[in-house]
A protein has these predicted regions:
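Membrane-interfacial amphipathic/re-entrant helices at transmembrane-helix boundaries
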Residues: 1-65, 94, 102-109, 184
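Extracellular/periplasmic helix-loop junction at the C-terminal end of a transmembrane helix
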Residues: 143-181, 212, 332
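Helix-loop-helix "hairpin" substructures at the membrane interface of multi-pass membrane proteins
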Residues: 9, 29, 182-262
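Alpha-helical transmembrane segments within multi-pass membrane transporters and channels
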Residues: 92, 102-145, 291-293
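Generic structural signal for small/hydrophobic residues in well-ordered secondary structure
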Residues: 57, 81, 94, 121, ...
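Single transmembrane alpha-helix segments in multi-pass membrane proteins
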Residues: 44-101, 127-140, 215-218, 222-226, ...
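Cytosolic-side transmembrane-helix boundaries in multi-pass membrane proteins
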Residues: 1-40, 214, 218-223, 227-235, ...
Length: 339
């Protein structure tokens, strides 16, 4: 009986300790978030000091968004798609066709490309949502290759192997001023960063919502989620569709980066690159795919300037990461800095 007050006192002490631990973790996450956005905002100023250039940072943002789109489905729902390059390419072609044939409007091109890719993904998702595992992945590859060969063969519309060109991103008229995103690389970087921030905010909002928690429940145990009455197929279809919209959005931005769209953007090898970025960075973390894209794009840019066989070195790097950092680069960093 004399020990009871000690136990009670211990419990009282445990409460503030838990609160302070939670506050410390929250403060750490906030500090990391501030560091990430500060680095992105100041990238045009510090990348040249490291031998980089502004356009490289722009490519990192766009491909990082594409990798995060794949991870939205793979990392948080547990569904692997090897055909996401199809929506990336459709977004690029949709944006390019608007700028080339319809109207000289950058926002309209982005909107049209995003809508085209997202709706195409929604239709396909409704057809294959009951497939799982390798069957789902193979069906997405097959449909992706269908779109690839359409773009490759329909040369009168898509330009065939040469791609859709020429079209150019147009200046943005912001009331009293005009932002020249065609000739000013820094201005274009900040425009892409703004678009990137909108997509990231939307992803974060969805993942923090009840729907996002349901996605995680399906990832962890689909059978249990189904037993609890969750309409699994509906949630997977919605997650797949949202992922396709984000991917098409990234594809639209990529068309603006290059001022052309070509069939290679729809090829399954491009899907493999996106999955590789997500896995290298850490596919069960929100920011991991962006880190993977940074490593992939910078490594590719450097090695390709030395040898045309840069894919060999990228593959070797990927194998090393998978063997020694199974949770990705970000996962390894978290383990090392964790108290």
């Amino acid at each position: 009986m004399k020990d009871l007050p000690k136990l009670k006192s211990g419990r009282k002490l445990a409460v503030p300790v838990a609160i302070w631990t939670a506050k410390l973790e929250s403060g750490r996450k906030l500090a990391v978030l501030v560091a990430i956005w500060t680095a992105l905002v100041l990238a045009p100023f510090w990348t040249p000091l490291l031998g980089g250039y502004t356009a490289l940072g722009t490519r990192v943002l766009v491909l990082g968004l594409a990798a995060m789109s794949v991870n939205f489905l793979l990392g948080f729902t547990g569904v692997l798609s090897f055909g996401h390059a199809a929506w990336f390419g459709i977004g690029a072609y949709g944006c390019g066709m608007i700028l080339k044939f319809v109207a000289l409007s950058t926002p309209l091109g982005i909107f049209a490309g995003t809508l085209a890719g997202g709706l195409a993904g929604a239709v396909l998702g409704a057809l294959i949502v009951r497939r799982r595992g390798v069957y789902f992945a193979m069906v997405t590859i097959a449909f992706g290759q269908v779109f690839y060969y359409i773009a490759f063969q329909w040369s009168s519309v898509t330009g065939g192997d040469d791609g859709l060109r020429p079209f150019y991103r147009q200046p943005l008229h912001l009331g009293v001023t005009t932002l020249d995103i065609l000739n000013n690389a820094v201005a274009f970087y900040y425009f892409v960063l703004f678009c990137f921030a909108l997509a990231v905010a939307a992803m974060a909002f969805i993942l923090r919502s009840p729907f996002g928690r349901t996605m995680l429940a399906i990832r962890e145990n689909e059978r249990r989620a189904r037993f609890l009455g969750i309409p699994v197929e509906l949630h997977i279809w919605i997650a797949f569709t949202l992922s396709c919209f984000f991917m098409a959005y990234a594809g639209s931005l990529y068309a603006l980066v290059n001022n052309f769209a070509d069939p290679r953007g729809l090829h399954y090898s491009q899907s493999g690159d996106f999955v590789m970025m997500a896995v290298m960075g850490g596919m069960r973390s929100f920011w991991g795919p962006l880190l993977g894209a940074i490593v992939f794009v910078v490594f590719q840019d450097y090695v390709s300037s030395v040898t045309i066989n840069w894919q060999i070195f990228i593959g070797f790097l990927f194998v090393l990461v998978v063997l020694f950092f199974p949770r990705g680069i970000l996962g390894a960093i978290r383990r090392r800095v964790a108290p």
